Structures are given as C-alpha cells and as structure tokens.
Amino acid sequence: MGALSSMFWALWYILPAYFANASPVLLGGGRPIDGGRKWRDGNRILGDGKTWRGFLGGVSVGTLVGVLQYYLTPAFYGSLKTAVLLAFLLSFGALMGDLVGSFIKRRLNLPRGYPAVGLDQLGFLISALAFAYPVKTISSGQMLFLLIFTPLVHWGANYFAYKMGWKSVPW
C-alpha cells in the first residue's frame, strides 16, 4: 500500500471517532453527566460542558457514520456487524477519552473550554484506538500519521466552529 493510500485508509478508519468527537458541540446541552456533583477537591467532576445529550448524540452520529462507510466500502469492514461494532467502539472510545480529559482538566483547576495542548487533541484519539483495538486495528505507521494529523484537524475544526458561532473560544 502506498503512503497516500495508507493515510487515506487511516482517516477512513478513524472517521467515526472524528464525527463522534465533533458532534457534541452541535448536539449537546441539557443535563450534565456529572449531575452537578463535585470531586473531593471541591471542583466539578466533569463540568457543564459534558452532557448526556452530547455524549449519546456523539456516539450515535459516529456509529451512523460507520454504517454509511460500510455501504460505501463493504470490503473494508467485511460485514455490517463488524462495521457497526467498530464504529460504536471508536465513537464511544473517543468520547470516553474526552471525558477523561475533562476530568483531568478539572483536577488541574483549568476552566471549561480552556486549552490543554495534547490532552484536547489526542486523548480522544488514543482512547478511540484502544477501544477499537480488539475488533480492527491499523498499522503503527497509520497510527503515527493520525497522531500527527489529528491535532491539525482538531485545531482547524475548533476554529471553524468558533467562526460559525458554535463555540465561544477558538480552541
């Protein structure tokens, strides 16, 4: 497989996680996952920015993206069952990684929306890859490409969301 082809399939593989991670900006709101509870340090466990609607909406959107991908490239997945499971795990893993990042940011007393370089851009990716590993994985070279490429996509998407008025800060 050539380098460009390898990069394309790496992006195709991770696409459900990208969509899942971006969707809560548009679908979120409502009841916070932590229910307003505080950790023993006195800070919120996750904060108002992590809601059930955003989490479940993100997992749903990411899973749907995987189903659509299956119909476009069935050979990539082998079966619809594998596509649904992989897309669900990538999406769920991405948002679990985002929740862990939010938890860590609250422990560091970082306010909601405050940037944490590396944690914001890669936490969701690493968690998505880990959750999906038992079903289907990609090469180490493809993983390295995603580790380099994802922060660029993340920063660009956040800036776009800011310019569209969907986010209050450009990071």
Curated annotation (Swiss-Prot):
Recorded metabolic or biological pathway in which this protein acts: Membrane lipid metabolism; glycerophospholipid metabolism
A biological process term (GO) from this entry: glycerophospholipid biosynthetic process
Topology relative to the membrane: Multi-pass membrane protein
UniProt keyword annotation of Cell membrane present: yes
Compartmental location: Cell membrane
Enzymatic class: transferase
GO CC annotation: plasma membrane
Record EC number: 2.7.7.67
Transmembrane segments: 7-27, 55-75, 84-104, 115-135, 141-161
Cofactor: Mg(2+)
UniProt main location, coarse: membrane
Entry GO MF terms: CDP-2,3-bis-(O-geranylgeranyl)-sn-glycerol synthase activity
Presence of keyword Coiled coil: no
Catalysis performed (reactions): 2,3-bis-O-(geranylgeranyl)-sn-glycerol 1-phosphate + CTP + H(+) = CDP-2,3-bis-O-(geranylgeranyl)-sn-glycerol + diphosphate
Entry keywords, A to Z: Cell membrane, Lipid biosynthesis, Lipid metabolism, Magnesium, Membrane, Phospholipid biosynthesis, Phospholipid metabolism, Transferase, Transmembrane, Transmembrane helix
Family indicated by similarity: Belongs to the CDP-archaeol synthase family.
Entries under HAMAP family matching the protein: CDP_archaeol_synth
Record function comment: Catalyzes the formation of CDP-2,3-bis-(O-geranylgeranyl)-sn-glycerol (CDP-archaeol) from 2,3-bis-(O-geranylgeranyl)-sn-glycerol 1-phosphate (DGGGP) and CTP. This reaction is the third ether-bond-formation step in the biosynthesis of archaeal membrane lipids.
Name of the protein: CDP-archaeol synthase
Protein species of origin: Thermococcus gammatolerans (strain DSM 15229 / JCM 11827 / EJ3)
